[in-house]
Amino acid sequence: MALLQISEPGLSAAPHQRRLAAGIDLGTTNSLVATVRSGQAETLPDHEGRHLLPSVVHYQQQGHTVGYAARDNAAQDTANTISSVKRMMGRSLADIQARYPHLPYRFKASVNGLPMIDTAAGLLNPVRVSADILKALAARASESLSGELDGVVITVPAYFDDAQRQGTKDAARLAGLHVLRLLNEPTAAAIAYGLDSGKEGVIAVYDLGGGTFDISILRLSRGVFEVLATGGDSALGGDDFDHLLADYIREQAGIADRSDNRVQRELLDAAITAKIALSDADTVRVNVAGWQGEITREQFNDLISALVKRTLLACRRALKDAGVEPQDVLEVVMVGGSTRVPLVRERVGEFFGRTPLTAIDPDKVVAIGAAIQADILVGNKPDSEMLLLDVIPLSLGLETMGGLVEKVIPRNTTIPVARAQDFTTFKDGQTAMSIHVMQGERELVQDCRSLARFALRGIPPLPAGGAHIRVTFQVDADGLLSVTAMEKSTGVEASIQVKPSYGLTDGEIASMIKDSMSFAEQDVKARMLAEQKVEAARVLESLTGALTADAALLSAAERQCIDDAAAHLSAVAQGDDVDAIEQAIKNVDKQTQEFAARRMDQSVRRALKGHSVDEV
């Protein structure tokens, strides 16, 4: 008689069998896939031994190609060859056209304002293009590992917002992949270096890829990876080096026409080739569109110097956020192919006062870190060796009365995280509450970013302050935010998942943090004034209700004194004198003390009416 094998729920019947997992670095210029084999993380090459996969897709009526074959078609069929699609992820069409006016694609807007690219294969959005790149990487991994993947960890820039992260998840699902989690690229690099070298202390991860720049300040201690602060620029990378050099070559060659897409591509290819060559040589010869000439490393350095300086300014801000000085940094990890540029390594070394780490190929280090994390999450090894703590870059909170922002989760809080805070109603009989979710560091709503609005209805009609609403903010491991509001006595609730249609601009992220420091004193004063005005409004609202109900308890003289005090409070509450408003509130309290006592006595008598002392 055959016996049925029964295993514990959630456990494999063959616990010794390794599950197949991969880490994917979905890059702007190039992408990679890596896995852990025999305890070592390694990137997986194609049939020709190439580890990088150009993030380029060429579309035709009967299909598409991805990678090198697609990139080779770029010059001949620019409109149907999509590259750097990561820059378009989560952005509106208007935003893309404003940021990248020279893109050679035929764009059309969908009903929600998101971009659609008109290709020979039809209208495609950035999510679909990204999915095709992910499919190619997954196919490479499945062939190399001789099986289907059980899960993947995909890396994203630290500054990707909710919409961009969600778009990446959607692309993975469209590619048929199970996403174990999204992982910030600098954090993935820290995993790769942290496990290999065992260093403990503060580490800076300088990640300059093709399309984005991220700086993360981390503390590694006893296997714990804690991100102290993050910063960067979501639209600055090696692609910008390429375009600056291409424009320089255009000027030298005297090419004025920008409408010829083929020439545009030739110029860009020549710039990329020259940039790579100048990492090893002092001079390179360029031959493009019938023009021949020389470019020196010094000329190239002059072109990109301002961009490199921008990255160092972001480094300085991140260090300040983390509360550390450059000399406190134990190691500087270099990530991204653009960190091969000698000027970048030189300036970064000067800034931090130490030679940057480049032991792991900067093109591969992110994918390797993602593979290590995927191996843990899929269940192949215990995660007791390592705890990973990411952070949110900007504070999250709610609008409260008076246009104030109440922060629920401060910036640089480690994620995943859930925080709850109780709020109450402002008016008698209030049955609904508007929940306005904010992001930013300032004290007033007008100075912060609106993320979402929703309403909680069905609140029982109680006196002001009688209903209690608990608002819970939950940020998952991928940085996506869910907000739930629940009235505690009835259990009625409403919730929302925040998915902005497009993200912050480059300047907004930096300025929101900078302004919070520049206007700190001014903001505190503005908050104190707003809070006093809210309290004045609450006192006057409550007094009006009391007078309407029980004016008969007052003599004419008493009523006049209270009316005078209330009128004075109403007048000073229109001004900007915090102390005057506070004194006026105290005066109203003083003038109404006897009135409040009589109302209390009356309420007690009404409650006792018809009852004996023994019953009480």
Swiss-Prot record:
Q: Is Nucleotide-binding tagged as a keyword?
A: yes
SUPFAM superfamilies (UniProt xref): Actin-like ATPase domain, Heat shock protein 70kD (HSP70), C-terminal subdomain, Heat shock protein 70kD (HSP70), peptide-binding domain
Matching PROSITE patterns: HSP70_1 (PS00297), HSP70_2 (PS00329), HSP70_3 (PS01036)
MF GO annotations: ATP binding; ATP hydrolysis activity; ATP-dependent protein folding chaperone; unfolded protein binding
Tell me the superkingdom of the source: Bacteria
Q: Which InterPro entries match?
A: ATPase_NBD, Heat_shock_70_CS, HscA_NBD, HSP70_C_sf, HSP70_peptide-bd_sf, Hsp_70_fam, ISC_FeS_clus_asmbl_HscA
User: Does the keyword ATP-binding belong to this entry?
Assistant: yes
The free-text function statement in the UniProt record for this protein reads: Chaperone involved in the maturation of iron-sulfur cluster-containing proteins. Has a low intrinsic ATPase activity which is markedly stimulated by HscB. Involved in the maturation of IscU.
Q: Which HAMAP family match?
A: HscA
Official protein name in the record: Chaperone protein HscA
Provide the species name: Salmonella newport (strain SL254)
**Upper lineage:** Bacteria, Pseudomonadati, Pseudomonadota, Gammaproteobacteria, Enterobacterales
Q: Which gene encodes it?
A: hscA
